């Protein structure tokens, strides 16, 4: 590499070789960001074969400082401003520094990547002392880093548009960012360099950095408008200068305005012409504002601008008028920087004709007299000449005159005097104006000459004078005249006063005045009259100039005004009244008469008065004494005319002042249904009308302004709504006027639906006794037949009440029951309907008391239990009766001591059914295998049953085997289980076909089933069927092999049979007489058996003990399991001790036996399965706890339907809702004094329970 060259490598570019000049700050070839290698001097110092010279690079470049050592084995390191960097090629603390080259060749070049200002320093290459050479230090190499300015800050702001006024001086400031060396700044204005610039260099934000601040003084011109003013900064680190600029908006005035009009210099224009004057102003920023002035006053301020050409234009459009003569029109231009307004003007010279020609003077004149006229024109420019014409004949004027007119014009005047004759009448007299300047136009004024002369004749046509005409008649009068100029006006007069056509429309119009009509030389005018009294003897005249004609009418009319006069206006009962009837005027006279409401009154004649319309007057008087009944009556006066056959009437209404009086039709009582509306009407007469209607109820005054449920109507009537029973009663009305007061009582009768107030529930009676079920209600009205009764059975079925007596008195109804029977017990419903919905309904129970009836099947009930003192037994005694039953127990006739801890009794009362469960713990064969007697007692008697407690044994044979269905291949069987011996039993069917010997067996599954269908049979075959029961101790009926039936299956062509009747049970035939040999064998067998009895007895006792232990364990486990699983929550029990127990009840005609293994008898699902706490009263609340299913299974021990019959007709209730039906009756314990207004109108369920009407 040459000593005067450096290599610069930019990113992604090939190396570029430039000549290196050693002048500071002018190393343009080094201003890149690539690798810079310092030039190596041609003659290196001692010990070095290569060293770099001073180097200048741009910030961000990579530079290599050369160091070639002649003693390669020495330790070499670089020093930066005296700081040793160390011999390590990866220089610690300087990640951008590294040593490059082959150390064996003595190459220790320092490589600096991405140079920044911190690398601007002096560098030395130092060689340590070694065996090969001494310690060496190279001359210093100065590395200069050039930093370019990043930004120029221009004031005003760069990128903006700056508005200046042309010719004014402005200051622009430009400040560079930090750089090294300081940048140079110049200003360029519109492509020209600004000379007046001052700059200063200042220290930058860091050491070795500088910034330049330059200030330029600029005076813009109009040519600079829209140009850029640029600040340009440069330094050696920049390849191209950086710039900042703003746009100059130079304001300067526009050029002078120009009016583009051909007649600009002369200004000649014709009046009426539409003149358009364009004005243009060029240049200016902003563009010029133009306006037009007329005689110094603005007339148009509208203008347009073409920005591209910088031209403003405005057009003045005007219609020239005569007054515009001599007007000065000016166009002015200016903008915001104009020193003064620029103006261009024009003066108008207007030519205009006269706007009008006028003839002064009258053209109407009597014949043979002179007419003097003057013709005058309006101002014109230039002047005009005048001439006269009469018809087609030109007349000579008397004289002519010219005067100055308006707007620089002239006025012409011509006078004319003319003698008129009759033949000149109607000719046209014309004044004409003319001039050469207006040769195409004619201006003239014409008048018609009117020569006056009088008419020749005048007369009236109409009815003949003296003829009588009835008022209201339409009369036509016509006035006629011949000749005359002007045409005769024909004026009508009545009694010397002009007759005018009325302006306002009248139906019909009494006067219709026609217009003058002409027919040839005859003129006429019609006057039509509807004749009235004012026209009587009136004189109607017609005038035409000095001529006149007249006629007179005679009118017949009835009284024009018939008036009754009274001597007093304020009358009170007993006052005297004098009335006078006066007929003002009529023609001919009339006859007067007076009556009151059709009754003729005695009257006397009164002194007549003068009558208008030249008619006759009349008057008569009458005397009256008035009462309150006369108020409003009319006294009528009638005036009758015989000639006219017409009567005119007038009346006087009597105004009698009297206090209020209630009329006979006044209502005294009003009926209304509760919650409805009521109107208490008022029929009162008073004069003046009552001032107030005051209503009081129970001593309290009702507000006249109204209330929530009442208002007083304008006529005094009282209106009520949402009426309640509390509103029932008398209402007092107090009426008052200025004459006095009056009072009346009105009764309001409020009808409301019945409400049951008392209904005793339950109602009790002994069997055979008599009782009344009493139902007391609150209702209005109380009707004799409003009570009815129903007896309810199951599902509220209505039953017959023919054996009961119904009666009622007032608000109480009774249902009388005589010789009460158990079948009459149950629910009864009292229904009350008084015609106001809804009807009231109340439920009541009739309880018929009877002595206990114990369920005691015959001949005996057995209960089995192991007698080894390890098990327990429960005896169940059930009875019916009312009232509640008490139970007692005996064993073998001896009262049972229930204080003994081995005995526990639980009592259960459910309606009429009562139960006692006696549990015996640790059953002992010696003590407890006995006959127990249960006695049920109440106030009406007692009853008892016996229960035998026995030991565990084989089961008894089943009972009642019968066939329920038969088919060709099957037979359906049903039976009743016998005593199971205290152990679980199962059933087995043995059968045989009689045609084919041999027995077949079939086990019944499930084991506890009591019905079974035997299949696999042959059609048309006779079978014999046996049923056996067995338990762990053996089979039932081993001697006779159980009970049996015989059947014959039908053929395939026969229909299957269903039967509910048991077939005859076929017993095995009796044994034949025993022969001797078999008897001997039997005796021998007995002897053998006697020898083995001891061994067999012992074995039997052991086996029995083991069975008892197993049964006891299983029974206890089963009882505990049932207790946990089947707790009965709603039962009512009585127990002496808190022990679990079971129940046994006897109701079969056959003996039944119960074991203690898994024993859980249960009652049938009757009323005793649910609690009657909500439906019955008087039931004992007793604590009882035993397995919940205790009563479901005992149903099988009761007799079949019909064996016992119904002991008590019980009301069936929903087991899930033990309330009586809510809407069927009213609560007998309700609050009696409530009224409907105080009750909640919500649903029944929203009331408290005690107000819902439920039986509890």
Curated annotation (Swiss-Prot):
- Ig-like C2-type domain span: 39-144, 149-247, 256-347, 354-448, 454-554, 558-649, 754-846, 852-953
* Annotated signal sequence range: 1-35
One GO MF term on file is:
myosin binding
User: One GO term of the cellular component aspect?
Assistant: membrane
SUPFAM superfamilies, alphabetized: Fibronectin type III (SSF49265), Immunoglobulin (SSF48726)
What tissue expression does the UniProt record report for this protein? Answer: Expressed in kidney glomeruli. In the embryo, expressed in the mesonephric kidney at 11 dpc with strong expression in cranial tubules with podocyte-like structures. Expression is observed in the podocytes of the developing kidney from 13 dpc. High expression is also detected in the developing cerebellum, hindbrain, spinal cord, retina and hypothalamus. Expressed in skeletal muscle during myoblast fusion such as in the adult following acute injury and in the embryo but not detected in uninjured adult skeletal muscle.
Arranged from A to Z, the UniProt key words for this protein are:
Cell adhesion, Cell membrane, Developmental protein, Disulfide bond, Glycoprotein, Immunoglobulin domain, Membrane, Myogenesis, Phosphoprotein, Repeat, Signal, Transmembrane, Transmembrane helix
Chain positions found as Phosphoserine? 446, 1112, 1119
UniProt PTM comment: Phosphorylated at Tyr-1208 by FYN, leading to the recruitment and activation of phospholipase C-gamma-1/PLCG1. Tyrosine phosphorylation is reduced by high glucose levels. Dephosphorylated by tensin TNS2 which leads to reduced binding of NPHN1 to PIK3R1.
Which ranges sit in the Cytoplasmic compartment? 1100-1256
| Gene disruption: observed consequences | Death by postnatal day 2 associated with proteinuria, edema and massive glomerular vascular leak. Kidneys display enlarged Bowman's spaces, dilated tubuli, effacement of podocyte foot processes and an absence of the glomerular epithelial slit diaphragm. Impaired skeletal muscle development characterized by incomplete myoblast fusion.
Location of this chain's protein in the cell: Cell membrane
What is the purpose of this protein? Answer: Seems to play a role in the development or function of the kidney glomerular filtration barrier. Regulates glomerular vascular permeability. May anchor the podocyte slit diaphragm to the actin cytoskeleton. Plays a role in skeletal muscle formation through regulation of myoblast fusion.
Q: Any idea what this protein is called?
A: Nephrin
User: Which organism is this entry from?
Assistant: Mus musculus
